[in-house]
Amino acid sequence: MSAAVMRSRAASPPTLILYHAECADGFGAAWAIWRRYPNAEYRPVKHGEGPPANLAGHHIGLVHFSYARPTLEAIAKDAASLVVLDHHITAEQTLADLPYAYFDQKKSGAVLGWEWAHDEPAPWLLRYIQDKDLWDWALPNSREISAALASYPFDFQLWTNFEQQELEREGRAILRYENELVTKLASHATLVQFEGAT
């Protein structure tokens, strides 16, 4: 089932999006949905923490993240609706049979979020996030764009204004600086013996 089919099954637009915190792919998924549904509430969530309070009655989207099955089932029971968009194999192995869960390991959370919310192909920014998140590194200047993106805060308006060539330029400088630091640190390395081996 495609993300677009999942969207067509949604009873109403989302009122609350929960996305993986401190992660470009998680925020990219939230940004993708925000581009279509700017009036929803967007909350970052972290692994190892329980879901936020006051989820009852919301039309919830959970992107690039999922909770344990009992937690998801409890959320689904109280929510007006729930959709889970994820690409992690561990979550898919335990949640794939849930009618509100959609998984695709060949796509990033950001691209899944875009495909769920939009009919047109994902924009360049999300394709680059996917290239890094899936460790493909197939797009030109992908490492540069990834380095530049990591230097910015997670802000919807800011991300909307990114330009590809500018991120490439910034990323080249960041990678050059990182490589120089590594070279300097490596020049001070000394061999030591550890448990009889060098």
Feature locations, PLM:
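A charged, amphipathic alpha-helical module
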Residues: 152-198
